[in-house]
Amino acid sequence: MPELDLELEQIINFRQYPIDNEVFIEQCATELDKKGVLTLPNFINNETLLELTIEAKENQFKAYYAKSTHNIYLTEIDTKLPPDHIFNYQVISSKGCITTDQIPENSKLKSIYGSIIFKDFLARVVNERKLYEYTDPFSSINIHYAKENQELGWHFDNSNFA
């Protein structure tokens, strides 16, 4: 494993979640395999969480808001199926979003996303040889905003894991 990044050590609760520890990584992978989900409460320390919350609020004015409908598979309506078929059932997404290029360069979100140790941890937990950064300059990191009566409609993600 790479040497621990001091900035990452100040972002993540390493005492509780030693993401560079072989035994911990194996425990996480086992839990994900058994339960289909891995939950790490308080993974990001409180100070960082507060900082990220303030940062998100300060940048909310940059958000693009949109309302759309989609099915749970995020695919087009299948005209071969009846309109009331579950595949064609439409849910609503009405939210705001800022994209990677709108997130401050010094954001700890970018530090986490770019961390080799964090990527190695995730790769091992999800049983991938290596994870790569998403090269889309807008979609690698997003902050979603939902005001009252706005929502992100339920859907299956397009990626293997989220």
Feature-to-residue mapping (PLM):
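Conserved short histidine dyad/triad with adjacent acidic residue
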Residues: 126, 142-157
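Signature of the catalytic double-stranded beta-helix
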Residues: 44-47, 51-61, 83-136
